[in-house]
């Protein structure tokens, strides 16, 4: 049975998680799972999950844990069974302690290991500048502040959760895209590559 490696990206909205995950996907031949992209896809396709998630996304709130956990469990299990997948980069999951605990329980059932948790730390001013130019539905100015508040209250506690497990590495996300990538590769050299 093959071992599957997971990298987790944490950081506030606009910190560059998706950008850096895509760069790593190409370099490491990992699969990128963005919970935000999966939710937007379900909303656009008007699936049952999309209908349930839509109001939460539009208000800048987190989608309830049970919906997210079920969605991610199915994707991780599916990818685990694909022979050409050596690793998964999780972007936007977990976002709560409950989701992180569920992920731990899931990977115990499978031959899966979390290799690193990368926190992209970035100043709020830079976040506002970046998000203002993206043009996504959930990047409207009135929602950005709420999304940051939700992040601080519900997702930031994960930093301590993963620090206690000796998995957390914090990267300065205020740097250029290339400098952030280089910092990530330096952290991962000993852990994944």
Regions picked out by a protein language model, each given a short descriptive name:
Residues 1-193:
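Glycine-rich phosphate-binding loop of ATP-dependent small-molecule kinases
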């Amino acid at each position: 049975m093959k071992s599957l490696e997971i990298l987790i990206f944490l950081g506030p909205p606009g910190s560059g998680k998706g950008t850096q995950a895509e760069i790593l996907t190409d370099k490491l031949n990992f699969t990128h799972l963005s919970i935000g992209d999966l939710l937007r896809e379900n909303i656009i396709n008007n699936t049952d999950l999309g209908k349930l998630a839509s109001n939460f996304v539009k208000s800048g709130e987190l989608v309830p844990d049970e919906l997210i956990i079920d969605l991610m469990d199915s994707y991780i299990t599916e990818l685990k069974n694909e022979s050409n997948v050596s690793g998964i980069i999780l972007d936007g999951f977990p976002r709560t302690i409950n989701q992180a605990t569920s992920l731990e329980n899931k990977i115990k059932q499978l031959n899966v290991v979390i290799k690193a948790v990368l926190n992209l730390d970035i100043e709020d001013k830079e976040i506002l500048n970046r998000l203002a130019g993206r043009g996504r539905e959930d990047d409207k100015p009135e929602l950005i502040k709420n999304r940051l508040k939700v992040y601080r209250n519900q997702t930031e506690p994960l930093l301590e959760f993963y620090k206690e497990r000796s998995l957390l590495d914090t990267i300065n996300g205020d740097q250029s895209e290339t400098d952030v990538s280089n910092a990530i590769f330096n952290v991962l050299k000993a852990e994944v590559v």
